[in-house]
A protein has these predicted regions:
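Long, contiguous internal "core" modules enriched in hydrophobic/ aromatic residues
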Residues: 1-327
Length: 327
């Protein structure tokens, strides 16, 4: 199997210069040494020339850089993305805890061990696989989680509120997907998603009543969360598509794209909406807005549209955002 040969720092600088990137050499040396050529290549790929005959669905860029590309701007894009990941991860953490709490409240309303009962969940939910994954997390947590160890020694079983503390967002999202549709709608409404089903066509209504759209959005946010947790590139990431038909009937979410959303703007808008319900007065939307203004808009060769942002993005992200109290 052939692989690309490794290159020295001097060779990397020469490659970038020959392909048309303007170099601040001391800065470039520092970044290539600290961050690596390969990691940065994911950011300067967006600065490579896109041929006129490129496939719009799977465009392949040329090696040559767009005129005006500088290492300084690529480093600025990297820094913006790093700050964006930090902010997004913070927001998703709050959403994860809130979703876990609401799902847990529904599950334990009659029995603390109801999560073990497959009849509680919708047809098609792989309860056995989900429960096996949860038990695996419990076993791994015994050595470090005092509550898990206590319940293992004293009772031999675990109420959901104890189990919940070892679940990650993907576990909770999958569990939410497994709930009956009426439970999903109830939890979704708790987050402020008051869908006007009367504005949906018959096919869209059926889809909405079969499964709440928040399920797919949580799936998308799980992907976003994992991107952030693994320090991967976020700003122009294509995500698991989430339907927008039902949520676009909510005035504060009307700027979502038609049909479905697979770019970052939709995820950020839904996050801002949920966080205003979870933490009234949250400054998260304004922090996001400020970051875009201070760090992204100074990048002369990048466009906010790459992340799926519409013209009215600022008003939409900050809708009903009155308080500046930090939380």
């Amino acid at each position: 199997m052939e692989v690309k040969p490794s290159t020295t720092l001097e060779q990397q600088l020469n490659i970038l210069s020959e392909r048309g990137m303007k170099l601040d050499e001391p800065l470039a040396r520092q970044w290539l040494t600290s961050v690596s050529y390969y990691r940065l290549s994911g950011y300067w790929y967006a600065y490579r020339v896109l041929p006129e005959d490129a496939n719009p669905k799977q465009p392949v860029r040329l090696d040559q850089f767009v005129e005006g590309t500088s290492f300084t701007e690529v480093a600025g894009l990297y820094e913006f993305d790093r700050k964006l990941r930090t902010l997004v991860h913070d927001g998703i953490e709050r959403i994860e805890v809130a979703l876990r709490t609401r799902v847990g409240e529904w599950i334990v309303q009659n029995d603390a061990l109801a999560y073990c009962n497959p009849s509680l969940f919708r047809e098609g939910f792989d309860h056995v696989a989900w429960l096996a994954k949860v038990y695996g997390r419990i076993v791994r947590a015994r050595s470090s989680n005092a509550a898990i160890l206590h319940y293992a020694n004293e009772y031999g079983h675990y109420p959901f509120w104890v189990v919940a503390e070892v679940l990650d967002f993907s576990d909770v999202s999958l569990l939410f997907d497994g709930l009956p549709a009426d439970a999903q709608h109830s939890i979704s409404t708790d987050f402020g998603f008051d869908v006007d089903a009367g504005k949906l066509n018959s096919k869209q209504k059926k889809s909405y009543h079969d499964k709440d759209p928040l399920v797919r959005w949580c799936e998308q946010l799980t992907v976003v969360r994992n991107v952030c947790a693994h320090h991967a590139r976020l700003f122009n990431r294509h995500l698991t598509p989430a339907s927008t038909n039902a949520f676009r009937t909510i005035p504060a979410l009307s700027s979502l794209p038609d049909g479905q959303s697979d770019k970052l703007y939709g995820a950020l808008l839904v996050m801002a909406f949920m966080l205003r319900t979870i933490s009234p007065g949250t400054t998260w939307p304004s922090k996001l807005t400020k970051l875009i203004h201070t760090d992204f808009e100074k990048l002369s060769l990048r466009s906010i549209a790459e992340m799926g942002f519409p013209d009215n993005w600022e008003d939409s992200l900050n809708a009903s955002h009155k308080s500046e109290s930090s939380i």
